Design a protein with these regions (language model features):
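Helix-biased detector of long, well-ordered alpha-helical tracts
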Residues: 2-195
């Protein structure tokens, strides 16, 4: 799997700016409806975005693998150095990567989004375009989450996956094959260069 985003060019989905409204004008439910329109919904999703909680049906006989990562503006991404679609892409793939590292197939995502009140809606359109692009690329479904206002933009993604056999960090045995998808330490080195 390639965990890097193919392009920093805004996708047509993220370019949808039908109306220019503020977050306060849209309200929480209006924002959720706007951002999740056209979201992928695959097998196993009984109830997804729009209700109090998601209802999922895992594949019988598989183990459920769960992880969460939080990306915070100024720490994990910067508005001046990368496109908002890249932030959404990264939020999905770092979680899918953790699930895959455990020998599981990523299936579902839940997103908790904190947004400063003065954030242009267009920025969130782009963030969700990146989330949508990554979700389709890795066949995972965004099934729920929460939106709140706060001092800095942050994306907390919880990914759920399924595995027949779980692979843990301490579970490697002589003769096992170890694989990496890119240069070790490259992400940290890149961030250090940008700072």
């Amino acid at each position: 799997m390639a965990w890097t985003r193919r392009s920093s060019t805004p996708s047509p989905e993220g370019a949808r700016i039908a109306e220019r409204g503020s977050l306060s004008e849209l309200g929480e439910f209006g924002l959720i409806a706007r951002l999740t329109a056209g979201a992928r919904v695959g097998p196993g999703v009984e109830v997804g975005v729009g209700d109090d909680a998601a209802v999922l049906t895992p594949t019988p006989g598989r183990k459920l693998v769960v992880t969460t990562d939080v990306l915070v503006e100024g720490r994990h991404f910067s508005a001046g150095l990368s496109a908002p679609a890249d932030w959404g892409w990264k939020a999905v793939v770092v979680n899918c990567s953790d699930v895959a590292a455990m020998g599981a197939l990523p299936r579902w995502l839940v997103l908790a989004l904190t947004v400063p009140a003065d954030t242009p809606v267009e920025v969130l359109d782009q963030v969700y375009a990146g989330i949508g692009e990554a979700s389709r690329a890795f066949a995972v479904d965004l099934v729920g989450g929460d939106v709140s206002d706060g001092p800095a933009l942050s994306l907390a993604v919880t990914a759920l996956g399924e595995a027949e056999r779980v692979v843990t960090r301490g579970g490697a045995r002589p003769g096992d094959h170890l694989a990496v998808s890119g240069p070790l330490g490259a992400a940290a080195a890149g961030l250090a260069l940008l700072r």
